[in-house]
């Protein structure tokens, strides 16, 4: 009996020693162990672990992180009511001030550097605003019509609603290439390829609304053939009247250009200004003497109007090239503008001189 009790005591002492070496019971997990005897340590350990897991998750999502300043900047662009507010310049800002403001905003809102929701749309708005305000003609028309026609709204409401006359002739991507030497300083460019969740949401909602509208319109359409015919009857009447009018209308006796389909294949010149024109084979029978003289005056007037219009187009083209060369400081555009000949303007000057001399 004494030997048995001695063995039990030795077993108890061995168990106590094992517990002391492990510092906690075997069935208690290490993370829930409280070394100081209070439950606050366990709670603090759990909170620290959760914080570390959240930090690791945010670091894994670094490509889509954005700062509060970037988000506020996008929201400011969305609230702008005109192009001057978008660029943050006054209405009498010079070209240099516009370029400086654009460079600053383009670097700040480029999709490669700003991942805030709506940053891509804000970047487009900045590029469009600069492209319009940097063009003297478009800026003059924009200032004349006012800024109530130009609005920038959130992506979930509606995309851009810019006044069509003030749409830019150059895209934000082309502007960025011009200012930053064909590539953006941050490296690889995927301009406008970042589609935000808001944009996906808008397209899904817009598609759903459009489908719903189409269904409603189909339900409202008349289902009978007679009703459809009654609706198309006014259109058919207009088409028939137009065809009859064209059949009854007589072709003019001349053309300033060669038109074999209408029979204008015989070349002639006016006696006064030597203006070339074309007639059909029956022209000599219908026009002689005074009637021919009056007709040639009409031909010369039409020809001068045509040359005047062509001269205006040539001047407009040369002016646009000159403006672009000055805006982008491109020597090739400048040389092209200087070498562009105004042939129709030279013809117009000669014709006016002959007309005054005659």
From Swiss-Prot:
Assigned GO CC terms: endoplasmic reticulum membrane
Keyword presence, Glycoprotein: no
Keyword Chaperone part of the UniProt annotation: yes
Residue span, J domain: 82-146
Bilayer topology annotation: Single-pass membrane protein
Transmembrane domains' residue ranges: 228-248
Localization in the cell: Endoplasmic reticulum membrane
Domain of life: Eukaryota
Alphabetical UniProt keywords: Chaperone, Endoplasmic reticulum, Membrane, Transmembrane, Transmembrane helix
Name the record gives this protein: DnaJ homolog subfamily C member 18
Organism per entry: Macaca fascicularis (Crab-eating macaque)
Name of the gene: DNAJC18
């Amino acid at each position: 009996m004494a030997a048995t009790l001695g063995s039990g005591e030795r077993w108890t002492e061995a168990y106590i020693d094992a517990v002391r070496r492990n510092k906690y019971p075997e069935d208690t997990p290490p993370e829930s162990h409280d070394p100081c005897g209070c439950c606050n340590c366990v709670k603090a350990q759990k909170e620290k672990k959760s914080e570390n897991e959240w930090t690791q998750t945010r670091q894994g999502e670094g490509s889509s992180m954005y700062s509060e300043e970037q988000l506020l900047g996008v929201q400011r662009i969305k609230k702008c009511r005109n192009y001057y507010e978008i660029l943050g310049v006054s209405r009498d800002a010079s070209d240099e001030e516009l370029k400086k403001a654009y460079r600053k905003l383009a670097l700040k809102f480029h999709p490669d550097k700003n991942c805030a929701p709506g940053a891509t749309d804000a970047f487009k708005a900045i590029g469009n605003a600069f492209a319009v305000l940097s063009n003297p003609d478009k800026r003059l028309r924009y200032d004349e019509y006012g800024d109530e026609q130009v609005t920038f709204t959130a992506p979930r409401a509606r995309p851009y609603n810019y006044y069509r006359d003030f749409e830019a002739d150059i895209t934000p991507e082309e502007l960025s290439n011009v200012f930053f030497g064909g590539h953006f300083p941050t490296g690889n460019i995927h301009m406008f390829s970042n589609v935000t969740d808001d944009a996906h949401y808008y397209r899904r909602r817009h598609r759903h609304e459009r489908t719903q509208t189409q269904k409603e319109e189909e339900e409202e359409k008349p289902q009978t053939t007679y009703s459809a015919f009654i609706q198309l009857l006014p259109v058919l009447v207009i088409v028939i009247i137009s065809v009859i009018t064209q059949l009854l209308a007589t072709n003019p006796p001349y053309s300033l250009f060669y038109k074999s389909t209408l029979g204008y294949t015989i070349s002639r010149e006016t006696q006064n200004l030597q203006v070339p024109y074309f007639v059909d084979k029956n022209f000599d029978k219908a026009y002689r003497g005074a009637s021919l003289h009056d007709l040639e005056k009409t031909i010369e007037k039409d020809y001068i109007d045509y040359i005047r219009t062509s001269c205006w187009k040539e001047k407009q083209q040369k002016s646009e090239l000159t403006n672009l060369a000055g805006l982008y400081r491109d020597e090739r555009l400048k040389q092209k503008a200087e070498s562009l000949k105004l042939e129709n303007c030279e013809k117009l000057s000669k014709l006016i001189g002959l007309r005054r001399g005659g």
